[in-house]
Structures are given as C-alpha cells and as structure tokens.
C-alpha cells in the first residue's frame, strides 16, 4: 500500500484479536491500518541533550520491579517504555497502571499494548494499597489503560483504588492520571466524588489539528470538558494536564492549547519531548531544544499556571511529588 505522504508500506493482513493477548508494534497498528506510519522511514538522530546515562547500580530498580510482580501489578513506566524508568525507580517512585496492561485504544504514539482486555481484578485496589504500604510511599500516581469495554470506563475502579490506598496509607497523597471516560464524563466524575484524589490529571497530549492522527478515538473538546467538569466539582483540588512535542505541531499551537487548559481551570502543566517507541509508531518530526522548553515554562507562568514542568524528559508523573510541592522540575 501507499501512505498519504506517498511512501510505500507493507500491507498487513487483518486478524481476529484474542482476549487477553497483548498486541504491540506492527500487530497493534495493523488492527486498523495507520496510514502515516512507515517502518522503513529514516529516523532523526538524537541530539546530545536527549542521551541518557544509565545508573550503574540496579538494586533499587530490581526492588521496585519485584514489589510490582509480587502483587501481579503493572507500572506504566515499564508498559509504556518510559525513558525515565531508571531515574524514577532509583528515586523510589513508580506510577501504577491499573485495570490490566491491555488498552482498548491503539494510539500510534504509545507503547502500551492494544487488544481485548481481561475482566477487572476486584482485588487489585487492595493489592495496590498494600504495595504502596510495603514501599512506604508518601506520594503515588495511579493511571490506567483505556477501558472502553466497561460501562463506567473504569471510574469505579479508580475510586476503589484511591479509597484502599487512603485506608492503609492515610498520609499518602494520591494523584490519578485518568483516561477520557469517553461518553461517561459526568458519571465518572460523580463516582470519583466518593473518593477524590489529591491531584486530578488528564493529558491532552497534543494539538487539536493532529488529534485524528495521534489520538484515534479521542476528542480534544471532550478532554477539555472532563478537566472543566472535575474542577467545577472540586475547586480546591489541583487539575493537571500534559503535552508531548515533536509530532509536527508548532510552538504557537502548543501555546494555544496551554491557554485552552487555563481557560478550563487547569493549574498544573507538563510538557515533554515525544520519543518514538519503535519503527511501527509515529515518527519524531523534530527534537525540541531545551531553550524552547524554558520558553513554554515561562509562558505558562504568565498564563497563570501554578506549576509547569517543561523539559525534554518531562512526563506527566515525572517527579510528580516535587511537581505537587511546586518545586522546579525539568
């Protein structure tokens, strides 16, 4: 087949997905052909500022992984191939990914597996709480795959997880990084009202012009509405959102999205560089230099964001505890 930009790609035959099987890379993008991905494309060379020095001691990393495995839990750090895994695990922090490791969406920027997920584990909220207790965490981030197969899109499971963590760890602060609860926004917020988090996070990811390409199945206005409705219900709880750059957007478009976030009551922001997980994902169109991230941070301050973490390796949950305290993260 030929893509919209005229490059030839290998046609992959459609197949029937099996429940509980993780589909990644070519298998993931062949479920519905992603026309703007060419696995034979020439990749941009990483600049010096994008190179990571790995730690020599992995004891802390192994300890975090063991704690996850022991309770049958998942971290988005591993499932999404986050470049900060070694730094965060060595710092003693991890972001728990609940509701399994199989997503019902197939966003071509994301390395989380796609497929037909298994039923929810009703004991998972308690397992997360016990792991938080074992690891003596004072700040924890809970995120999830998209679960469009669930009537409430997983809102009750989020609420149960917050409740169990608080019950076992009353001093622990909980940030939730939620999906868009497609078509169930008001229902989801009503459910979360029973056990609200300390920080509410939902990522817009990029600019509306590129949404069909980057976030198939999502809607820019829905995501803004979710952030707005939550803030209206919980005016004293910080709301947060994250953006990736380097996917073909302009700086002016990113600044416009930042203003949209402020107009919808969002008080915390993260902006980081998109990194291509494999040749079967969206290509990095450019590496944004550190000076431009500093510009985003400066403009965010002018717009009235209470905290903005902007830098090449910044991710939503990167040093989330420090972000919540208002400390500089970049």
UniProtKB/Swiss-Prot annotation:
Pathway: Protein modification; protein lipoylation via endogenous pathway; protein N(6)-(lipoyl)lysine from octanoyl-[acyl-carrier-protein]: step 2/2. It catalyses: [[Fe-S] cluster scaffold protein carrying a second [4Fe-4S](2+) cluster] + N(6)-octanoyl-L-lysyl-[protein] + 2 oxidized [2Fe-2S]-[ferredoxin] + 2 S-adenosyl-L-methionine + 4 H(+) = [[Fe-S] cluster scaffold protein] + N(6)-[(R)-dihydrolipoyl]-L-lysyl-[protein] + 4 Fe(3+) + 2 hydrogen sulfide + 2 5'-deoxyadenosine + 2 L-methionine + 2 reduced [2Fe-2S]-[ferredoxin]. Its EC number is 2.8.1.8. InterPro entries: Aldolase_TIM, Elp3/MiaA/NifB-like_rSAM, Lipoyl_synth, rSAM. It is found in: Cytoplasm. Transmembrane segments: none annotated. One of its GO terms (cellular component) is cytoplasm. It is an enzyme of class 2 (transferase). Its cofactor is [4Fe-4S] cluster. [4Fe-4S] cluster 1 binds at residues 77, 82, 88, 317. Binds 2 [4Fe-4S] clusters per subunit. One cluster is coordinated with 3 cysteines and an exchangeable S-adenosyl-L-methionine. It holds the Pfam family Radical_SAM. SUPFAM superfamilies: Radical SAM enzymes. Signal peptide: none annotated. GO terms for molecular function: 4 iron, 4 sulfur cluster binding; lipoate synthase activity; metal ion binding. Belongs to the radical SAM superfamily. Lipoyl synthase family. This is Lipoyl synthase. It comes from Haemophilus ducreyi (strain 35000HP / ATCC 700724).
């Amino acid at each position: 087949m030929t893509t919209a930009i005229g490059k030839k790609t290998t046609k992959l035959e459609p197949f029937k997905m099996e429940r509980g099987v993780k589909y990644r890379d070519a298998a993931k993008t062949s479920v519905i052909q992603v026309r703007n991905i060419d696995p034979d494309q020439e990749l941009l060379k990483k600049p010096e500022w994008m190179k990571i020095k790995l730690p020599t001691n992995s004891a802390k990393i192994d300890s975090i992984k063991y704690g996850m495995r022991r309770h049958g839990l998942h971290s988005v750090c591993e499932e999404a191939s986050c470049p900060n895994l070694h730094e965060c695990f060595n710092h003693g922090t991890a972001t728990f990914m609940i509701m399994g490791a199989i997503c019902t969406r197939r966003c071509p920027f994301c390395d989380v597996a796609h497929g037909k997920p298994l039923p929810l584990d009703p004991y998972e909220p308690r397992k997360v709480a016990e792991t938080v207790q074992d690891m003596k965490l004072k700040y924890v981030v809970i995120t999830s795959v998209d679960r469009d197969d669930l009537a409430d899109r997983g809102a009750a499971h989020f609420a149960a997880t917050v409740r169990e963590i608080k019950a076992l760890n009353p001093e622990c602060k909980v940030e939730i990084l939620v999906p868009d609860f497609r078509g169930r926004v008001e229902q989801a917020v009503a459910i979360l009202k029973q056990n609200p988090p300390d920080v509410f996070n939902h990522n817009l990811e990029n600019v509306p012009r590129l949404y069909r390409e980057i976030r198939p199945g999502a809607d820019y206005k829905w995501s803004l509405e979710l952030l707005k409705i939550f803030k209206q219900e919980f005016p004293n709880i910080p709301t947060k959102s994250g953006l990736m750059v380097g996917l073909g957007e302009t700086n002016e478009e990113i600044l416009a999205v930042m203003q949209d976030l402020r107009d919808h009551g969002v008080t915390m922001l993260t902006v980081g560089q998109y990194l291509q997980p494999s040749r079967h994902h969206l290509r990095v169109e450019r590496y944004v230099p550190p000076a431009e991230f500093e510009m985003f941070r400066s403009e965010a301050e002018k717009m009235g964001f209470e905290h903005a973490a902007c830098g090449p390796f910044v991710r939503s949950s990167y040093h989330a505890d420090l972000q919540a305290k208002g400390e500089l993260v970049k």
